Swiss-Prot record:
The record's account of how the chain is modified after translation: Glycosylated; by Pmt.
Region (Disordered): 41-66
The entry's keywords: Glycoprotein, Secreted, Signal
InterPro entries: Ig-like_fold
Biological source species: Corynebacterium glutamicum (strain ATCC 13032 / DSM 20300 / JCM 1318 / BCRC 11384 / CCUG 27702 / LMG 3730 / NBRC 12168 / NCIMB 10025 / NRRL B-2784 / 534)
Protein name listed in UniProt: Uncharacterized protein Cgl1651/cg1859
Annotated GO biological process: carbohydrate metabolic process
Lineage summary: Bacteria, Bacillati, Actinomycetota, Actinomycetes, Mycobacteriales
């Protein structure tokens, strides 16, 4: 009687085999279910694995990269958490930024940009992994008038104008309703 190969499950004879937890046991259609079953341990699979195939390539998404157009960003590296990357590429990094073969993103953004870019890492075997990196490059707010930190007191003159307009509107409504009331009597 011949058994199946554990990895290929190809019939080598007339018996069928079921593989469970690395043990191959014969199984027949007319098998006595109360009979004692002996199991044979299969040979270890000593097939060498292809380089880079043992660990899949996996990347970790860094936090949002922020900055101001015209000022260099603090370099950020895309971290490889599984496998070993040989190169990094991106076709849609914001203008002025570069990524090197270690996954380090550097440069100076040329214009405002808020969005993401796809980073692709490749290992020696050609296996690719991708991650999306978020960017937020905006102009700094103008500092013409120093802010006190409270929007309620920053423009007190505007608040005074608004309150005066509301009081005037209420006075007009009360005056009109009084005249209307006396007219209807």
């Amino acid at each position: 009687m011949k058994l199946f190969s554990r990895t290929s499950l190809v019939a080598l004879g007339t018996a069928a085999a079921i593989t469970l937890s690395g043990v191959t046991a014969p199984a027949f259609a007319d098998e006595d279910s109360n009979a004692a079953v002996s199991a044979l341990k299969t040979a270890e699979d000593n097939t060498p694995e292809a380089p880079g195939a043992s660990t899949p390539l996996k990347l970790e998404q860094p936090g949002t990269i922020t900055g101001v157009p015209g000022k260099a960003i603090t370099p950020v590296t895309v971290k490889v958490v599984a496998g070993e990357a040989e190169s990094f590429t991106s076709d849609n990094l914001p203008s002025g930024l570069l990524i090197d073969n270690t996954g380090k993103i550097t440069g100076t953004p040329k214009k405002e940009f808020t969005g993401s870019a796809k980073i692709i890492a490749k290992n020696e075997a050609g296996v690719e992994a991708e991650v999306y990196v978020n960017f937020d490059f905006n102009e700094e707010p103008s500092s013409e008038e120093p802010s006190s930190g409270s929007s309620d007191t920053d423009n007190i003159e505007n608040w005074i104008k608004i309150i005066t307009a509301v009081i005037g509107a209420l006075t007009t409504i009360l005056t009109f309703s009084t005249k209307l009331d006396s007219f209807l009597k």
